[in-house]
């Protein structure tokens, strides 16, 4: 019975890897199923389902500080529900990180995730040229002669953010030298297709994160190819921009303050809110209420959050909330880099660790210009990347050292 449950758990994990790129409801259902089966299996074994890791201390501190913002809320229940709308995912991480997956199944899961992202990329590129969303049966937003790709999601930002993180995994796998040339070329082709889908999304924040992923990966694995691969990326980007002038206009708008007025106004408004509420913040789900009080004069075509995850954390949870959130990710990077250095050169889990490092590095850069952590589609994939890395750290670094 227990062996059958373990097999079912693995299949649900693989299914989760596939559905992550296609459905918010699906990814939540599969995540819930993985958690439920994990608890059932450990109940059969009469074992503790969570394996210790020091990262949990940093995550727990972040949660405690975030909860402190409830002290100033006029409606504690509503604020708590709004907070848990995204941060419930973090509560599953100790269980996900403790999954006893073999390296083989972990790698298969990542391969399925990359394949799923490639299919989502092809669909997004189709949307870019046709403006058709076959899944939701709607017309897409038009920019010049082309359209914003949204994949299977409702937002181009959600689509771009998740494609960005999976691209990092495919790119890391390509950089890993201990595999055949055919396998490496397959990963490179996958990364290239996903790259085109990010371009098709017209998400400028994700565009800005791409060179960070490329350069950081090369600095980590093969500095000799830094100029060659970086130059190839520049040529590819220039080719896309030259042959599709509408994308050139979109790219140049990054540097035009007049075309970023809403974002700049939201940043200034957020700074004013933080100045008056630096310790506890304003609480989750209240940004629009305070926007009406603190808004600086000017044009706004969006609201709801600060259009910057760092500013948004400081607004919602105060400066202590921002500090503990950043500290949590610094701690995660520390444990991942430590694991990457300790694992043998030929260990395939090294490329998974590198992929998760590049993925979260990329999304943290993109988060300087947009709120991705508050988007549940992105939040789940973000924590998926973190949990996979922690899983390897627990299995191969932390617990062996403790024993």
Where are these regions (language model features)?
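Transmembrane signal-anchor hairpin modules in multi-pass inner-membrane enzymes, especially those
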Residues: 1-81, 101-107, 111, 176-183, ...
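Transmembrane alpha-helices of multi-pass inner-membrane enzymes
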Residues: 10, 33-39, 172, 354-403
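Alpha-helical transmembrane segments of multi-pass inner-membrane proteins
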Residues: 12, 16-17, 107-144, 151-221, ...
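Interfacial transmembrane-helix termini
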Residues: 15-34, 48-53, 64-89, 99-108, ...
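Membrane-embedded alpha-helical segments of multi-pass membrane proteins
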Residues: 25-42, 83-94, 159-167, 207-215, ...
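A membrane-periplasm/extracellular boundary helix in multi-pass inner-membrane enzymes
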Residues: 122, 128-129, 218-259, 268-276, ...
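A conserved mid-to-late transmembrane alpha helix and its immediate loop/hinge
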Residues: 195-197, 271, 277-280, 301-336, ...
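Long extracytoplasmic/lumenal interhelical loops at the membrane interface
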Residues: 257-268, 280-317, 340
């Amino acid at each position: 019975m227990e062996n059958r449950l373990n097999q079912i758990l693995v299949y649900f994990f693989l299914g989760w890897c596939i559905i992550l790129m296609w459905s918010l409801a699906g990814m939540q259902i599969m995540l819930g199923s993985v958690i439920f089966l994990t608890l059932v299996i450990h109940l059969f074994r009469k074992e503790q389902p969570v394996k210790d890791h020091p990262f949990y201390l940093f995550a727990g501190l972040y949660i405690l500080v975030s909860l402190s913002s409830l002290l100033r809320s006029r409606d504690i229940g509503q604020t708590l529900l709004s907070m848990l709308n995204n941060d419930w995912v973090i509560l599953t991480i100790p269980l996900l990180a403790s999954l006893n997956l073999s390296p083989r199944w972990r790698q298969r899961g990542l391969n399925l995730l990359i394949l799923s992202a490639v299919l989502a990329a092809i669909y997004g590129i189709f949307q870019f040229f046709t403006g058709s969303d076959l899944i939701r049966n709607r017309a897409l937003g038009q920019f010049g002669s082309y359209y914003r790709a949204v994949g299977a999601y409702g937002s181009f930002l959600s689509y771009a953010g998740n494609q960005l993180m999976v691209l990092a995994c495919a790119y890391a796998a390509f950089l890993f030298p201990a595999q055949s040339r055919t396998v490496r070329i397959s990963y490179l082709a996958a990364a290239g297709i996903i790259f085109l889908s990010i371009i098709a999304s017209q998400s400028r924040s994700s565009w800005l994160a791409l060179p960070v992923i490329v350069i950081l990966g090369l600095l980590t694995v093969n500095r000799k190819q830094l100029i060659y691969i970086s130059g190839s990326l520049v040529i590819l980007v220039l080719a896309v921009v030259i042959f599709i002038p509408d994308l050139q206009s979109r790219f140049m708008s990054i540097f035009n303050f007049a075309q970023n007025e809403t974002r700049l106004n939201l940043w200034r408004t957020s700074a004013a809110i933080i100045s008056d509420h630096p310790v506890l913040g304003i609480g989750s789900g209240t940004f629009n209420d305070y926007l009406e009080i603190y808004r600086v004069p000017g044009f706004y075509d969006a609201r709801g959050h600060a259009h910057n995850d760092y500013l948004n954390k400081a607004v919602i949870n105060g400066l202590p909330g921002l500090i503990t959130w950043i500290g949590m990710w610094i701690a995660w990077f520390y444990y991942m880099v430590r694991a990457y250095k300790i694992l043998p050169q030929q260990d395939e889990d090294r490329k998974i660790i590198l992929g998760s490092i590049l993925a979260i590095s990329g999304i943290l850069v993109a988060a300087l210009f947009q709120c991705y952590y508050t988007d549940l589609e992105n939040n789940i994939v973000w924590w998926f990347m973190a949990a996979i890395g922690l899983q390897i750290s627990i299995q191969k670094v932390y617990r062996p050292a403790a024993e």
